[in-house]
From Swiss-Prot:
Location (main, coarse): membrane
Family: Belongs to the lipid A palmitoyltransferase family.
Signal peptide boundaries: 1-24
Task performed by this protein: Transfers a fatty acid residue from the sn-1 position of a phospholipid to the N-linked hydroxyfatty acid chain on the proximal unit of lipid A or its precursors.
Name this polypeptide is given: Lipid A acyltransferase PagP
HAMAP family reported for this sequence: PagP_transferase (MF_00837)
Enzyme class (EC, first level): transferase
Compartments in which it is found: Cell outer membrane
Name of the gene this protein is made from: pagP
GO molecular function: acyltransferase activity
EC number: 2.3.1.251
Naturally occurring in which organism (per UniProt): Pantoea ananatis (strain LMG 20103)
Length: 190
């Protein structure tokens, strides 16, 4: 009886095993392809930039629905600072940038943030100088309240711009009284 059951189940189990192996190999290949695209874009942006960028932090806003009044009143929402970077537009018109900026964080302490940003860019008007974008940024930050240990971050990125002036923004997710911060800056391309 066991031999008959084993013989009956062996073909479907073997097919299932090979199916999972094939899916794992395909997933591994997709991850490698995505990583190769990412590193290629970073390298090309560094080696062949179209512009030099100046960054000026503009606003930090702590989401009022996720903070109590005590925290809101003691946090800094004017992140003065500056930064610089290089950027390019690819053949599809999408933006790629490498940057480093430093600004005053919620506790009014210096916070550096550097990384790579990508935005799919649209130019919906007849005036091609007007554009907006949606994408992501992947970078590293370090904060005073975390002992300035490097912390990686992948965040959403959005922008609206005209010509070489852009208003870029992100949202840092979090928990109650922590994170949930809208952060925006101006970026000029030269």
């Amino acid at each position: 009886m066991n031999r008959y059951l084993l013989t009956t189940l062996s073909a479907p189990l073997l097919a299932l095993f090979f199916s999972f192996s094939l899916q794992a190999a395909m997933l591994s290949q997709e991850i490698k392809s995505g990583w190769d695209t990412f590193t290629g874009n970073v390298q090309q942006t560094w080696q062949q930039p179209d512009a030099i960028d100046v960054y000026v932090p503009a606003i930090t806003w702590h989401n009022r629905w996720t903070y109590d009044e005590e925290h809101i009143h003691r946090y800094n929402e004017r992140p003065w600072g500056a930064g610089g970077g290089v950027s390019r537009y690819d053949e599809k018109g999408n933006w790629h940038g490498l940057y480093l900026m430093a600004f005053k964080d919620s506790f009014n302490k210096w916070e550096p943030f550097g990384g790579y940003g990508w935005e799919a860019t649209w130019r919906p008007l007849q005036d091609q100088n007007f554009h907006y974008g949606l994408g992501y940024t992947a970078g590293v930050t370090a904060r005073h309240n975390w002992g300035y240990y490097p912390v990686p971050a992948i965040l959403p990125l959005a922008s609206i711009g005209y010509g070489s002036l852009n208003f870029q923004m992100t949202y840092i997710p979090g928990t109650y009284n922590n994170g949930n911060v809208y952060f925006a800056w101006l970026r000029w391309q030269f």
